[in-house]
């Protein structure tokens, strides 16, 4: 089972033309547009390539839902269970790209990251309880956009047979979406800055942060390298 934030990744390819004569901004010429199902959907598609069955649990927006794109993007062995949130959009991240150098010029978030209301939280909690007993593994892709709260995280930690967690720090949640939200995780995927934020330590090495500070899990995988621990939770050199 994969549970996490629904994200639509939009790429707008534009040619910079120069500074506007009357405004302090760069004018661009539109060239092309690509839209992909990202976030929890991208993670589930990867998992589906090596697993027989994958279940996605998430929420999408009632406004600009992109449901057709999402459903057409998923592999055949993936089952989608999602709730539409009233008067909210599916999170869409629009990146404006200079195609000449494939450089991102700037990004626009179309989203509402307010927490789930009580009815939505109850729905998510029931789905976790329903599907956890039949799952070999639960993967959490927590991008910090309002899907998971303390209540549903607690249920995940109590019910998952094996819990793998990625808590991403991004421009929308800097400092508010840390791995320390999860009292239990069997497998954690964070990068060095995310580990530093979790223990409020800007300058120590990543080995010291994980080996000596309060990040207690069997294995941590970063985006740049892997760090393994022995049975005594000591860093293997």
Stretches with model-predicted labels:
Residues 1-23, 29-237:
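Ribokinase/PfkB-type carbohydrate-kinase core domain
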């Amino acid at each position: 089972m994969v549970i996490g934030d629904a994200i639509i990744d939009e790429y707008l390819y534009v040619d910079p033309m120069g500074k506007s004569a009357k405004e302090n901004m760069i004018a661009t010429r539109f060239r092309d547009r690509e839209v992909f199902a990202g976030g929890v959907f991208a993670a589930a598609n990867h998992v589906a390539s090596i697993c027989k069955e994958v279940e996605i649990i998430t929420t999408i927006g009632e406004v600009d839902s992109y449901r057709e794109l999402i459903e057409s993007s998923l592999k055949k062995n993936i089952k989608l269970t999602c709730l539409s949130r009233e008067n909210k959009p599916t999170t869409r991240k629009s990146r404006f790209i200079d195609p000449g150098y494939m450089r991102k010029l700037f990004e626009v978030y179309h989203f509402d990251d307010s927490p789930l209301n009580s009815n939505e939280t109850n729905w998510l909690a029931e789905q976790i309880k329903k599907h956890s007993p039949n799952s070999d593994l639960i993967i959490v892709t927590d991008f910090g956009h309002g899907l998971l709260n303390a209540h549903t995280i607690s249920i995940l930690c109590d019910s998952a047979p094996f819990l793998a967690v990625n808590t991403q720090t991004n421009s929308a949640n800097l400092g508010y979406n840390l791995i320390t939200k999860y009292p239990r995780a069997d497998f954690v995927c964070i990068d060095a800055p995310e580990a530093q934020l979790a223990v409020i330590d800007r300058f120590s090495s990543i080995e010291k942060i994980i080996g000596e500070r309060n990040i207690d899990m069997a294995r941590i995988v970063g985006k740049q390298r892997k760090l393994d621990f022995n049975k005594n939770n000591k860093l293997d050199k």
